[in-house]
Amino acid sequence: MSLDTAEKQKLIENHQVHPTDTGSAEVQVAMLSKRISKLSDHLQGNIHDFASRQGLLKMIGKRKRLLSYLKDKNVQKYQELVKKIGIRG
């Protein structure tokens, strides 16, 4: 499940570090979280869609690695992001 351009732009605006930021860890985690949420909803109704399930697990792993990186680099930003997105809690 991909995000349309308007959704991506809204996520970037809400999580960017500076005005031209499109690829910081915060933005990437926010986009992955939104995609994970959409794909989880899809898998609730399509339990035999194993290809999508595998993609979901890959996205969860990537988000976990990005969050780990962010936690190592800046704990305060990590905590703010986790609270803002509503994960880990």
UniProtKB/Swiss-Prot annotation:
Which CDD domains does the annotation name? Answer: Ribosomal_S15p_S13e
User: Highest taxon of the source?
Assistant: Bacteria
Q: Does the keyword Nucleus apply?
A: no
Cellular component terms per the entry's GO annotation: cytosolic small ribosomal subunit
Q: Name one GO molecular function term.
A: structural constituent of ribosome
Keywords, A to Z, come to: Ribonucleoprotein, Ribosomal protein, RNA-binding, rRNA-binding
Q: Where is this region: Disordered?
A: 1-23
Asked whether the UniProt record includes Ribonucleoprotein among its keywords, one would answer: yes
- Record-linked InterPro entries: Ribosomal_uS15 (IPR000589), Ribosomal_uS15_bac-type (IPR005290), uS15_NS1_RNA-bd_sf (IPR009068)
Q: Which GO terms describe its biological process?
A: translation
Question: Where do Basic and acidic residues bias regions lie?
Answer: 1-18
Assembly and partners are described as: Part of the 30S ribosomal subunit. Forms a bridge to the 50S subunit in the 70S ribosome, contacting the 23S rRNA.
> Which family, according to UniProt?
Belongs to the universal ribosomal protein uS15 family.
**Which function does this protein serve?**
One of the primary rRNA binding proteins, it binds directly to 16S rRNA where it helps nucleate assembly of the platform of the 30S subunit by binding and bridging several RNA helices of the 16S rRNA.
This one is known as: Small ribosomal subunit protein uS15
